[in-house]
A protein has these predicted regions:
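Noncatalytic luminal/extracellular "stalk/propeptide" segments of secretory-pathway proteins
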Residues: 22-30, 50, 54-162
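Second-shell loop/turn segments in exported
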Residues: 32-40, 54-64, 116, 127-132, ...
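Active-site-adjacent substrate-binding region
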Residues: 181, 187, 191-192, 251, ...
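Short helix-loop-beta-strand segments that form the rim/entrance of peptidase-like active sites
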Residues: 47, 301-326
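Soluble metallo-hydrolase cores and metallopeptidase-like ectodomains found primarily
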Residues: 29-31, 106-143, 206-285, 297-300, ...
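Metal-dependent peptidase/peptidase-like ectodomains
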Residues: 107-109, 122, 127, 217, ...
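Extracellular/luminal Protease-associated
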Residues: 63, 112-216, 283, 389
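N-terminal capping segment at the start of a domain
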Residues: 24, 29-63, 200-208, 277, ...
Length: 472
């Protein structure tokens, strides 16, 4: 009898854990499958990115087009039928690009195709170029060895579906200028953090370490980096770099938010979005007009249902991601203040890796175990789109990162980025690079995910924690 009592007690002890498992009802799964097929045939996503890139164009944070982009986003949310539309201010330092030139001087005189790195100061410098194969080689250079010279880091990125080598290419851009200056350099140039063979350089933000006096810093197009490498192999090569750019006070932009109100738990939200800003060279189609369009279209399709999902779908067009995740940080500060806020954050996902087809899915949080069943259910509805469930992979998108760092649950919808760094941060980032069918597949995936996450009977593990958001 005692053994039976112990067994019953053990069973009862397990019951709360079983009850806490997050699952999704069959009816919601059927609705999601219908939404998936509807999204594949829908053209809203492409129409939205076409509108943004055509009517607004390049939209560097704090620039002339920034307020036009904000007005565009508000109007687009309203025209797509979102129940609520509002803005939240985001302030940041303002950086401007005006002109940029570089040239080899001397016996082999010729122009070089370059672009200033975001955050670079203006100025004209001229000096002998010293080539380094990678960042580690620059870091190993003796102190003072670059006095009066221009450092050239020639790291060549390789293509990958997940873009994993961007960690190395991006590190050259973010750390290289400060490292060069510490060695005595008067300027810095790098092979673009890209995988293309076109004569279009890739920009991107750089940071100068505290105590370092900033110097002009620029990226060469890939062919120009090859040319400069050949010239330095021939012997001493001098370059003149002339940049007119720099910081100019502060600016205020806005996170633009559209919401489909939930039917029974309207204060609990599923957050999806992309960043509204872009660099100023192209029209920001893949980075990140596509992400804005994908998530706006997903919210729109869910909003057309006769019955709204249980929780609200919140689509955020984030401000100034490119220069330091300012929009994501501001969102986390406003909506992740305490445990009560975090309890209302069901889950979040950002589309910010172009418009290639989504091939993998996962979710994560501070307490993920109870939501594994629901994650698998979502994955089953995504599977016909060619999307695999990868339970040990993934992470939050850039602008979702700050609220995830505070304990918010995240979803990972991995896009094929094989060709992403051919275009990233270049003048070639234009609408014609987007495949409408691939974009529709993205819309279908985000629609399924957002709807089912909003319909789940339980949460995905958001738990408040005292962790600082990532810096960029």
């Amino acid at each position: 009898m005692r053994r039976l009592a112990v067994a019953i007690s053990a069973l009862l002890a397990c019951t709360p854990a079983l009850a806490a498992q997050t699952t999704i009802a069959d009816g919601a799964l059927r609705t999601a499958a219908q939404l998936r097929e509807q999204a594949l045939a829908d053209t809203t996503g492409f129409a939205v990115v076409e509108s943004l890139t055509t009517e607004v164009g390049p939209r560097i944070a704090g620039g002339e087009a920034d307020p036009r982009a904000v007005a565009w986003a508000k109007a687009k949310f309203q025209s797509l039928g979102f129940d609520k539309v509002w803005t939240e201010p985001v302030s940041f330092p303002k950086w401007q690009r005006r002109s940029e030139q570089a040239a080899v001087i001397g016996a082999h005189a010729q122009p070089l195709h370059i672009t200033a790195l975001g955050g670079s100061p203006g100025g004209t410098v001229e000096g002998e170029v010293v080539r380094f194969e990678n960042l580690a080689a620059l870091q190993a250079a003796p102190a003072g060895s670059l006095a009066g010279k221009i450092a050239f880091v020639d790291y060549q990125m390789t293509k990958a579906r997940d873009g994993k080598d961007y960690g190395n290419g991006g590190a050259v851009r973010s750390k290289g200028p400060s490292e060069a200056i510490r060695k005595g350099a008067i300027g810095f140039v790098m092979r673009s953090a890209g995988t293309d063979s076109h004569r279009v350089p890739h920009t991107g933000i750089t940071r100068f370490d505290e105590g370092v006096t900033p110097a002009p810093a620029a990226a060469l197009s890939v062919p120009d980096a090859n040319q400069l490498a050949r010239l330095t192999a021939l012997g001493s090569t001098r370059v003149r770099l002339a940049l007119d750019c720099g910081w100019d006070g502060t600016a205020t932009s806005y996170n633009v938010i559209g919401e489909i109100t939930g039917r029974s738990k309207p204060k609990e939200v599923v957050v999806i979005g992309g960043h509204l800003d872009s660099w100023d060279l192209g029209t920001g189609a893949i980075d990140d007009g596509a992400g804005v369009a994908i998530t706006m279209a997903a919210g729109h399709l869910i909003g057309q249902l006769k019955q709204a999902p249980k929780r609200s779908i919140r689509v955020v067009a984030f401000a100034n991601e490119e220069q330091g995740l300012y929009g994501g940080k501001a969102y986390a500060a406003a909506h992740g203040k305490d445990a009560k806020d975090m309890a209302l954050h069901q889950i979040g996902a950002e589309s910010d890796f172009g418009a290639g087809r989504i091939y993998a899915f996962n979710t994560g949080s501070a307490a993920p175990d109870a939501s594994r069943a629901a994650t698998r259910q979502i994955a089953e509805v995504l599977a016909p789109l060619g999307i695999a469930y990868e339970p040990s992979k993934g992470g939050p998108g850039p602008d979702v990162g700050p609220i995830s760092a505070k304990g918010g649950a995240w979803a990972w919808l991995a896009q094929d980025g094989t060709d992403y760094f051919d275009l990233h941060h270049t003048a070639d980032d234009t609408l014609d690079k987007i495949d409408p069918k691939a974009l529709a597949q993205n819309v279908a995936a985000y629609t399924v995910f957002a709807y089912l996450a909003a319909e789940a009977d339980g949460d995905f593990g958001s738990r408040a924690k005292s962790v600082q958001p990532p810096s960029e």
